[in-house]
Design a protein with these regions (language model features):
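Periplasmic c-type cytochrome electron-transfer domains
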Residues: 2-74, 135-150, 167-172
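Flexible coil segments in periplasmic/lumen-exposed cytochrome c-class electron-transfer proteins
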Residues: 33-37, 78, 87, 94-100, ...
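Extracytoplasmic/periplasmic/luminal assembly and interaction segments
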Residues: 53-102
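Conserved beta-strand positions that form and line the central face of beta-propeller blades
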Residues: 68, 105-106, 130-133
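Amphipathic alpha-helical recognition patches that constitute DNA-binding helices
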Residues: 71, 105, 117
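Conserved acidic functional residues
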Residues: 80, 108-109
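Short Fe-S-cluster ligation motifs
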Residues: 110-128
């Protein structure tokens, strides 16, 4: 019984200390300061689990069709995705350096994520990251899937290929 009382007292003390720390404004939410590693880890774990759980829609078409990949590249450029994520031969825009967490390197992400997960992220966005919900912005599912097709091909797309697919937009 004493152990339970001690655990309860400790839990209350931790809750009070956490409340003072977070609600007292001691935790900085400034984008100029990086989160501690434990916070990055916790948010990353929650984000990965949430995406995996909610991403249930499967591709309605093959994603390796060249015309779909090229349409996805054009949509990626037209929607300004390169501003935060860059593109083959196109650097990230300067403003993206101020985003926290940093926008991910898509060449790495697309290797780890399934198409259904990429679709879910592009369609629904990610809270507190700057990643918009393009599905709410009126982007159609076929266009979203085309972007996913391009993303899956992204690691092997050369700057010349990308420029040929999108023309002058974005200007490298």
């Amino acid at each position: 019984m004493r152990i339970l009382a001690a655990i309860g007292t400790l839990a209350i003390a931790v809750a009070i200390a956490a409340s003072i720390f977070f609600l007292g404004g001691y935790y900085s939410v400034a984008a100029t300061q990086r989160d501690p590693a434990i916070v990055d880890w916790a948010i990353g774990a929650v984000r990965a689990a949430s995406i995996s759980r909610h991403a249930t829609q499967t591709p309605p078409m093959p994603l390796d069709v060249p015309e779909i990949v090229q349409a996805g590249a054009r949509a990626y450029a037209d929607r300004g995705c390169y501003g935060c994520h860059g593109a083959p031969g196109v650097d990230w825009e300067k403003f993206s350096e101020g985003l926290r967490p940093d926008p991910p390197d898509l060449k790495e992400i697309v290797e780890k994520r399934e198409p259904r997960e990429l679709f879910w992220v592009v369609a629904n966005g990610i809270k507190m990251t700057g990643m918009p919900a393009f599905g709410l912005a009126g982007v159609s599912d076929p266009e979203l899937w085309a972007i996913v097709a391009f993303l899956k091909k992204l690691p092997s797309v050369s700057p010349d290929e990308f420029k040929a697919w999108v023309g002058a937009n974005p200007a490298p």
